[in-house]
């Protein structure tokens, strides 16, 4: 479970941070446009380097290796608890990345190729900005999202066979669902889960049509990842 006191302190500090950050690049906007379309105002969105998140850590059980996002990385020893630290944090229209994870472009070769992990991270955090900009629909506030970390050992975990109502999930789960959609669309656009996720998202945002085949080359974080059947 995440240290919510430390995370709350970070949120408070970021609220007073005056760093402007950068706008999404043209490639990033093109990529995010396939998910959020015009329901996200990219002109108001800023990506900022230097989120003070090193002191924020959380321990969680291993997640089942049934999702695309879990199967593109190496397995961990059975029963091992996972200790991690956030790579980024979204606050209103700004996304604060740790220095290790801040990049000048998260989609540098798009649409010809996709750096999958970087694109998934961007899509997850952009979904929090979408939640804020569409808060009349989502009911989102940063404090509500923060509370999820004190009530669940893993607020990002979702059931791949769960409800088809996107807004029925927690805010971090919604970001993770978008990550999973990016992963499945990139690697298995005709798979059953890809279609389910697409149909779920299409109810709340103007997600673009699914392609009939893979749209671009995909850079994976693990060379031994098995792509066949990854989103069935």
Predicted segments — roles?
Residues 27, 33, 83, 90-92, ...:
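Metalloprotease/metallohydrolase-associated module, dominated by Zn2+-dependent proteases
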């Amino acid at each position: 479970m995440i240290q919510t006191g430390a995370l709350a302190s970070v949120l408070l500090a970021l609220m007073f941070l005056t760093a402007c950050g950068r706008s999404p690049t043209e490639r990033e906007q093109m990529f995010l446009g396939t998910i959020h379309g015009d329901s996200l105002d990219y002109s108001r969105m800023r990506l900022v380097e230097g989120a003070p998140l090193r002191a924020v850590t959380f321990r969680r059980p291993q997640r089942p290796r049934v999702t695309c996002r879990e199967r593109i990385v190496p397995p961990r020893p059975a029963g091992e608890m996972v200790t991690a630290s956030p790579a980024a944090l979204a606050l209103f229209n700004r996304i604060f990345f740790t220095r290790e994870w801040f990049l000048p472009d998260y989609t540098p070769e798009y649409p010809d190729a996709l750096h999958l992990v970087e694109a998934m991270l961007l899509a997850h955090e952009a979904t929090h900005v979408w939640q804020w900009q569409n808060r009349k629909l989502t009911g989102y506030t940063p404090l509500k999202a923060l509370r999820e970390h004190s009530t669940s050992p893993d607020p990002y975990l979702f059931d791949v066979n769960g409800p088809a109502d996107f807004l029925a999930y927690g805010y971090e789960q919604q970001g993770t669902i978008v990550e999973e959609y990016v992963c499945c669309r990139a690697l298995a656009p005709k798979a059953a889960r890809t279609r389910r996720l697409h149909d779920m998202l299409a109810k709340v945002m103007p997600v673009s049509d699914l392609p009939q085949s893979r749209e671009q080359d995909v850079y994976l974080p693990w060379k031994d990842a098995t792509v066949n059947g990854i989103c069935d």
